């Protein structure tokens, strides 16, 4: 099933690119700047030169204070659907104590096939690209990026980086992070490095038997779709991918959820109330009014602190 997911991701990227990116002559599916802008046109903020949405650094900092529950927004089709928060769990987490926030830079691989690879590599060389491998995308990373890779759950040969390239990713992204639906190698060497990382497995093999199919197009990670430029938030629980056009509203909502939890625990500390009298919403009108006043005060304090 995992391998089929990877093929579905590739097929989706390929079908999009066959219509949208005829200029991608190296058989690497990607978007032109105009296509990137068109397919992310709901975002009206700043962009990178390639058109990828660039959410503000301040939002990355805000997200570090949020839990998965606080940023999770129900949508059409169930929790995480409807174009809101896209959550994926069941990871091995390198540093559970670290929060990960950044902007998604996407890569997708597919299982290698010799006859296709010969054509792909030949066309890449015609464009001056020596090799379409993991380093092709890694070398494009910017500060604040999180590298998000669909390696279709591949274990042996699905090792997107070892310790040397992990170190490079950490330096290039300024510690942004790595999410790979695949594996790592050199875990002993990687473990001391202070960058968040989410992966499925480990294996001592070098990356192999996989062909780079797409860079900075929509990809599938588990059961969610990730777009280039998504706000990525990871903690010990899992990873959420937030469409940039929804990110500020979700962070504002998360502030209110955080304050509600804060107030709830303060009332529990008083020892006067049953849980059902306070959580999830206070029953007593006087308590509801007290909460609204507390919420207003704390929001003003939080907003004032962010202006400093």
Question: What residue ranges belong to the model's regions?
Answer:
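Feature captures the catalytic cores and cofactor-binding loops of soluble hydro-lyases/lyases
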Residues: 66-68, 80-228, 241-308
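Bacterial N-terminal signal peptides that target proteins for export
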Residues: 1-11
């Amino acid at each position: 099933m995992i391998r089929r997911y990877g093929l579905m991701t590739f097929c989706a990227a390929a079908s999009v690119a066959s219509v949208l990116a005829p200029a991608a002559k190296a058989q690497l599916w990607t978007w032109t700047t105009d296509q990137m802008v068109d397919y992310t046109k709901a975002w009206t903020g700043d962009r990178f030169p390639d058109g990828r949405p660039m959410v503000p650094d301040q939002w990355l900092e805000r997200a570090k204070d949020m839990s998965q529950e606080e940023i999770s927004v129900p949508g059409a089709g169930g929790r995480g659907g409807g174009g809101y928060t896209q959550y994926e769990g069941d990871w091995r987490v390198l540093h559970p104590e670290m929060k990960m926030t950044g902007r998604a830079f996407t890569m997708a691989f597919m299982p290698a096939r010799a006859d296709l690879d010969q054509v792909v590599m030949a066309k890449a060389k015609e464009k001056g690209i020596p090799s379409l491998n993991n380093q092709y995308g890694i070398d494009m990373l910017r500060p604040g990026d999180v590298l998000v890779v669909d390696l279709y759950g591949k274990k042996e040969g699905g090792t997107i980086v070892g310790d040397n390239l992990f170190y490079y990713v950490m330096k290039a992204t300024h510690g942004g992070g790595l999410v790979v639906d695949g594996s790592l190698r050199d875990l002993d060497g990687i473990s001391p490095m202070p960058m968040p990382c989410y992966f499925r497995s480990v294996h001592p093999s070098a990356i192999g038997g996989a062909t780079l199919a797409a860079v900075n197009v929509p990809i599938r990670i588990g059961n969610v779709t990730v777009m280039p430029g998504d706000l990525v938030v990871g903690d010990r629980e899992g990873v959420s991918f937030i469409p940039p056009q929804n990110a500020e509203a979700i962070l504002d909502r998360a502030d209110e959820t955080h304050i509600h939890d804060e107030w709830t625990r303060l009332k529990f500390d008083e020892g006067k109330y049953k849980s059902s009298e306070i959580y999830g919403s206070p029953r007593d009108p006087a308590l509801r009014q007290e909460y609204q006043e507390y919420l207003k005060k704390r929001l003003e304090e939080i907003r004032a602190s962010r202006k400093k």
